[in-house]
Curated annotation (Swiss-Prot):
GO terms for molecular function: metal ion binding; oxidoreductase activity, acting on NAD(P)H, heme protein as acceptor. It comes from Granulibacter bethesdensis (strain ATCC BAA-1260 / CGDNIH1). One of its GO terms (cellular component) is plasma membrane. It is an enzyme of class 1 (oxidoreductase). This is Heme A synthase. Its EC number is 1.17.99.9. Belongs to the COX15/CtaA family. Type 2 subfamily. Its main location: membrane. Interacts with CtaB. It is a multi-pass membrane protein. Catalyzes the conversion of heme O to heme A by two successive hydroxylations of the methyl group at C8. The first hydroxylation forms heme I, the second hydroxylation results in an unstable dihydroxymethyl group, which spontaneously dehydrates, resulting in the formyl group of heme A. Residues 1-22 are annotated as: Disordered. The keyword DNA-binding does not apply.
């Protein structure tokens, strides 16, 4: 990502008899400002994903039964309000079947995490909307970018609605958790919003791709890697949704078998059968890691800018694979699992940055253009 920042902030050069004079143009300053705003939003979404993971892992997600985008901003301020919310929670199956009798103090414990998760979502909305208005009014955003940013804002609003749609599935009779399908949709919307912001920010910083002749194959491999990362994260969402990580806590075998007993049983085995869901996630993670490392090796052989483009991807995929194993062996210990979920976003980041850095694959530098440093 540093290459993109250097590209945006690289000064224009004006020849003079005394040497070079350096200046950053107003357009470059505006691009850096806009990109910094979008990178801030990306960081906030990363935190949001980790908060969501902690909320799910601690069973806190169903503690607030009301959808109040504005009035729900403030927490309860009186004993009467706490008791009212606790009485609502006592009506859902999760209380009766999982947390029966844990008292108002126990309810407060799970309430605060879900409330923080929702509050952070509201803050993301404000950080998205208010600077967007300011930057547009002061004409710091290039006009061609405004429709895309409005679409991103709409996507952010939809994500909030999808979040409630997911939570509501946990209020059904005999339900003690949210629907894994709705959980995956909620996660997918978050990552789609994150990816759109990140790609746009990188493009704002570096609107003209750097020529990288002879790297078309590397770009294709990086695109395949990004696709595999996305599919593997979605598969991980189903692992989380049906709590498949609580079984088969050995690696690399599953109860002493490469392919676990019961694999593929049921017409929705890919989404609801625990051995199938966990094995598929393991297989996809391994395929993703191998593809990313192969992409990295190709980039290293090319050297120069290609090597710099693939290095973050190689580091991220190794760390994420190790965290996945650690999460499994720890029987989904909450701190390890939350870091694993956050690292998935960082791996997605590395894959996007790598692909974006290779936009100039196959292009040759102009004769009059300054040679890029290697």
């Amino acid at each position: 990502m540093s290459d993109h920042i250097r590209a945006a902030s690289s000064p224009s050069r004006h020849g003079s008899e005394h040497g070079w004079q350096h200046a950053v143009t107003p357009q470059q300053r505006n691009r850096i400002l806009v990109a910094t705003w979008m990178f801030t939003l990306c960081f906030m979404i990363l935190v949001m994903v980790m908060l969501g993971g902690a909320t799910r892992l601690t069973g806190s997600g169903l503690s607030i039964m009301e959808w109040a985008p504005l009035m729900g901003t403030l927490p309860p301020t009186s004993q009467t309000e706490w008791e009212r919310l606790y009485a609502l929670y006592q009506k859902i199956p999760q209380y009766a079947l999982v947390n029966h009798g844990f008292g108002l103090d126990g309810f407060k414990h799970i309430f605060w995490l879900e409330w923080t998760h929702r509050l952070w979502g509201r803050l993301i909305g404000l950080v998205l909307l208010l600077p967007l208005i300011f930057l547009a009014v002061t004409r710091r955003i290039e006009r061609s970018l405004i429709p895309r940013l409005i679409l991103i804002f709409v996507l952010g609003g939809l994500q909030g609605a999808v979040g409630w749609f997911m939570v509501a599935s946990g209020f059904f009779p005999d339900s003690t958790a949210v629907s894994p399908y709705r959980l995956v949709v909620h996660l997918s919307f978050a990552l789609l919003l994150y990816s759109a912001l990140l790609w746009t920010a990188l493009s704002v910083l570096n609107p003209e791709p750097r020529p990288l002749p002879g790297t078309v194959g590397l770009r294709r491999m990086s695109a395949v890697t990004l696709g595999l990362v996305c599919i593997t994260i979605i598969a991980g969402g189903f692992v989380a949704g049906i709590h498949a990580g609580l079984d088969y806590n050995t690696f690399p075998l599953m109860d002493g078998r490469l392919v676990p007993e019961g694999y593929g049983e049921g017409h929705r085995a890919m989404f609801e059968n625990i051995p199938t869901v966990q094995f598929d996630h393991r297989l996809l993670a391994t395929l993703t890691a191998l593809t990313a490392l192969l992409t990295g090796l190709i980039g290293f052989r090319r050297g120069g800018n290609a090597r710099r483009a693939v290095l973050p991807l190689m580091v991220a995929v190794i760390l994420q694979y190790a965290l996945g194993i650690a999460t499994l062996l720890s029987v989904v210990a909450v701190p390890v699992a939350v870091v694993h979920q956050g690292m998935a976003v960082l791996l997605l980041t590395a894959a996007i940055v790598t692909l974006h850095s290779l936009r100039g694959a196959g292009r040759t530098a102009s004769i009059n253009a300054p040679a890029s440093s290697h």
